[in-house]
């Protein structure tokens, strides 16, 4: 039985997982790498750290499984989206550290684009809003701030890519410069309706077309790994951004299905099918996947801080040693206190989209302590998800056609406390799958589909298995009171920005 290898390149670590033909996991390896914060709101990675951690985890997973290159039918890549690398076409050397999706350095550029009236045109073409989150203004910043970069780019000497594209380039020995439609759709440079790079957007952001990769289906033969990397060539057969890969891994192939992934941030996607749906509630319209040249679209809500808020409790405040301690600590909180954390550590994402505000605690008293902070931190993830859920239900024209269910995945879903509170606040069932590695599974499925190892999407969906369903247990009065308190906290934070 052949293996399929998934590369899951994330914000804080790189992982490789070998899946069997029955989608069970044969072996995995993970390696963290450093984050760099050179200025307030700036987040960077060393491209070599990303590459070296990816390569070493692939080799480690293969060794654990006793797998040779000839035993692997294909590699699927999934990646932190929007993060950008620009490198020399000949040497392969990056001209600067990778600028990470969380980075806010281009906030002023985005403000000017909005003030000049460009946002409606950009949104019409890309489905995105103008925000530092996306790749386009990051590329422009690199070209304008790295000495000589713009001239080199205009002479065709530089290449641009999101992390999937950079890894593909490195894996292929510098022979393949390509990406897939899901990653391209996150750049502010790609027209999601035509499926092509858009000349008007490229001109606006002054990004030379020669820098851009070829855009392919999410399940396709992108190229082959260099022989010397794994002692034999392996076909690279699938690519998708991490949230789209999780949507696939959760088997959300039917329009109306919603998944939410909890990692560093939180990202919810609602499959809208073959037609893009324009949001009236500041959600993004994006490509969910592209198979056989046909695009499926999604509404997406992006939250910048979820699991990283728990890391803050551990690393910043030192009130826990392990993430697993957060739920039991939250259980000890004083029920008479109503403490709200709005974790806008790098601004607020959907549906508020304010890059300037910063995090705040509301409702603290003299008796507020570690338990209340843990409680507020976990609840903040649930409240933010509620905001996305409500916006999606309002935007989706067929929202009342089927009972709402949220499929969840990611590290935070191991917390029963958080998942139960999420179901309570949504007033809807929350389904946690047996296979938690849904992002990697989605990448593996795309590669396995191309290689003929895995079946067509609907047959794959039949193999999805439920671990636990969390059902709402909170009274309507309590739910409404808590949601109203959250609304006041967010309003107060946004008002602080308006007052500056």
From Swiss-Prot:
It holds the Pfam family FGGY_C. Transmembrane segments: none annotated. Its EC number is 2.7.1.30. Inhibited by fructose 1,6-bisphosphate (FBP). Keywords: ATP-binding, Glycerol metabolism, Kinase, Nucleotide-binding, Transferase. GO terms for biological process: glycerol catabolic process; glycerol metabolic process; glycerol-3-phosphate metabolic process. ADP binds at residues 11, 15, 264, 307, 411. Pathway: Polyol metabolism; glycerol degradation via glycerol kinase pathway; sn-glycerol 3-phosphate from glycerol: step 1/1. It catalyses: glycerol + ATP = sn-glycerol 3-phosphate + ADP + H(+). ATP binds at residues 11-13, 264, 307, 311, 411. The keyword ATP-binding applies. GO terms for cellular component: cytosol. HAMAP family: Glycerol_kin. This is Glycerol kinase. It comes from Rhodopseudomonas palustris (strain BisB5). The gene is glpK.
């Amino acid at each position: 039985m052949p293996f399929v290898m998934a590369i899951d390149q994330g914000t804080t670590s790189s992982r490789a997982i070998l899946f069997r033909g029955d989608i069970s996991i044969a072996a995995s390896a993970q390696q963290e790498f450093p984050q760099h914060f050179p200025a307030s709101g700036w987040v960077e990675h060393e491209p070599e750290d990303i590459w070296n951690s990816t390569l070493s985890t692939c080799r480690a997973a293969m060794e654990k499984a006793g797998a040779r290159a000839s035993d692997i039918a294909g590699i699927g890549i999934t990646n932190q989206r929007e993060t950008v690398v620009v490198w020399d076409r000949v040497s392969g050397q990056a001209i600067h550290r990778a600028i990470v999706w969380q980075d806010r350095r281009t906030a002023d550029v985005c403000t000017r684009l909005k003030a000049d009236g460009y946002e409606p045109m950009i949104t019409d073409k890309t489905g995105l809003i103008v925000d530092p989150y996306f790749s386009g203004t990051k590329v422009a910043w690199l070209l304008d701030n790295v000495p000589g970069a713009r001239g080199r780019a205009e002479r065709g000497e530089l290449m641009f890519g999101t992390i999937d594209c950079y890894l593909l380039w490195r894996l292929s020995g510098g022979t393949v410069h390509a990406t897939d439609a899901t990653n391209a759709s996150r750049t502010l440079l790609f027209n999601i309706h035509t499926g092509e790079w858009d000349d008007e957007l490229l001109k606006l952001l002054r990004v030379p077309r020669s820098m851009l990769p070829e855009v392919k289906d999410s399940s396709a033969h992108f190229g082959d790994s260099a022989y010397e990397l794994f002692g034999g060539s392996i076909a690279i057969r699938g690519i998708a951004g991490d949230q789209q890969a999780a949507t696939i891994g959760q088997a959300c192939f039917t329009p109306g299905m919603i998944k939410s992934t909890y990692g560093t941030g939180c990202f919810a996607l609602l499959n809208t099918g073959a037609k893009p749906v324009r949001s009236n509630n500041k959600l993004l319209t994006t490509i969910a996947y592209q198979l056989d040249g046909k695009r499926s679209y999604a509404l997406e809500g992006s939250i910048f801080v979820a699991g990283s808020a728990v890391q803050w409790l551990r690393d910043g405040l030192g009130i826990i040693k392990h993430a697993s301690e957060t739920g039991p600590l939250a259980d000890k909180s004083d029920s008479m206190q109503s403490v709200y954390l709005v974790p806008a550590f790098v601004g607020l994402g959907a549906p508020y989209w304010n890059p300037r505000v910063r995090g705040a605690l509301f409702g603290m008293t003299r008796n507020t302590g570690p338990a209340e902070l843990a409680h507020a931190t976990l609840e903040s993830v649930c409240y933010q998800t509620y905001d996305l859920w409500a916006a999606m239900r309002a935007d989706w024209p067929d929202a009342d056609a089927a009972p709402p269910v949220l499929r969840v995945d990611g590290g935070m879903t191991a917390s029963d406390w958080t998942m139960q509170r999420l179901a309570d606040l949504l007033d809807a069932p929350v389904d946690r799958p047996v296979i938690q590695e849904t992002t990697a599974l989605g990448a593996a499925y795309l590669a396995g589909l191309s290689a003929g190892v895995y079946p067509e999407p609907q047959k794959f969906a039949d193999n999805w298995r439920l671990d636990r369903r969390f059902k709402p247990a909170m009274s309507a009065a309590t739910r409404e009171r808590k949601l109203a308190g959250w609304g006041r906290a967010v309003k107060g934070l946004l008002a602080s920005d308006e007052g500056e």
